């Protein structure tokens, strides 16, 4: 068997540190990954709650310059489901996962390295006929999985954006206009994906959603 190249200083043997008796674990991680991607793209936030760990490591430094070492699950769901983020009903997405490799850290933690393409398409209104913004990211993601009460859960992500299509200006933030024609409020995330945040009483505050810096 040809060994894969070294990844982030790890030897090929370490990157392939999943043996035959670990296949049920990998199947469990794949199931959690599938549920995560499908819950995002279908905007089924109850489904998302079922596949994530109680605490997650969210490393969004690639596009938000923010890192949360231990974000509670309820805060993670609130953040990604916000109408100015993936919860916008006018925003269509697909989180497409390509080939992958696995590293078993211990009996309750596995790290997956996944090729990713994430497509975003934002529409003008609920008719979903006119597209006002597009942005597709290509790269990879490092995903952490943890075994909770015998079941593997999605427990963190670190995207690595290699290149993008269409720029993505205007993807995140409020709709171009409200259904009644009234202009929406100021955009929360700019074209680079960085958010307007401030530090207040030891908390990182986003005008779209408050998440605790831990």
Curated annotation (Swiss-Prot):
Superkingdom field: Eukaryota
Biological process annotations from GO: monodictyphenone biosynthetic process; secondary metabolite biosynthetic process; xanthone-containing compound biosynthetic process
Keyword Lyase: yes
Catalytic center residues: 95, 120
Pathway(s) annotated for this protein in UniProt: Secondary metabolite biosynthesis
EC number(s) reported in the record: 4.2.1.-
Keywords: Lyase
Molecular function as annotated in GO: lyase activity
Record-linked InterPro entries: NTF2-like_dom_sf, Scytalone_dh
Binding sites annotated in the UniProt record for substrate: 40, 60
Phenotype on disruption: Impairs the production of monodictyphenone, but still enables the synthesis of intermediates until emodin.
Keyword flag Cell membrane: no
Annotated function: Scytalone dehydratase-like protein; part of the gene cluster that mediates the biosynthesis of monodictyphenone, a prenyl xanthone derivative. The pathway begins with the synthesis of atrochrysone thioester by the polyketide synthase (PKS) mdpG. The atrochrysone carboxyl ACP thioesterase mdpF then breaks the thioester bond and releases the atrochrysone carboxylic acid from mdpG. The atrochrysone carboxylic acid is then converted to atrochrysone which is further transformed into emodin anthrone.
Family named by the database record: Belongs to the scytalone dehydratase family.
Protein name: Scytalone dehydratase-like protein mdpB
Organism from which the protein derives: Emericella nidulans (strain FGSC A4 / ATCC 38163 / CBS 112.46 / NRRL 194 / M139) (Aspergillus nidulans)
Gene: mdpB
């Amino acid at each position: 068997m040809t060994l894969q190249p070294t990844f982030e200083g790890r030897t090929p043997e370490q990157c392939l540190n999943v043996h035959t008796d670990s296949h049920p674990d990998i199947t469990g991680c794949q199931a959690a990954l599938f549920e995560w991607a499908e819950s995002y793209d279908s905007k089924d936030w109850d489904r998302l709650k079922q596949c994530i760990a109680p605490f997650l490591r969210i490393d969004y430094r690639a596009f938000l310059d923010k890192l949360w070492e231990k974000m509670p699950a309820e805060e993670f769901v609130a953040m990604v489901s916000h109408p100015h983020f993936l919860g916008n009903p006018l925003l269509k997405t697909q989180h497409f996962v390509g080939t992958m490799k696995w590293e078993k850290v211990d009996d309750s933690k596995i790290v997956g390295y996944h090729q990713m393409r994430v497509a975003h398409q934002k529409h003008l209104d609920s008719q979903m006929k006119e597209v006002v913004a597009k942005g597709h990211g290509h790269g990879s993601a490092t995903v952490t999985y943890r075994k909770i009460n015998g079941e593997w859960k999605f427990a963190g992500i670190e995207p690595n954006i290699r290149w993008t299509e269409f720029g993505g200006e205007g993807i995140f933030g409020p709709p171009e206009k409200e259904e009644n024609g009234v202009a929406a409020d100021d955009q929360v995330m700019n074209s680079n994906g960085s958010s307007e945040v401030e530090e207040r009483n030891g908390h990182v505050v986003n005008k779209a959603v408050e998440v605790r810096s831990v």
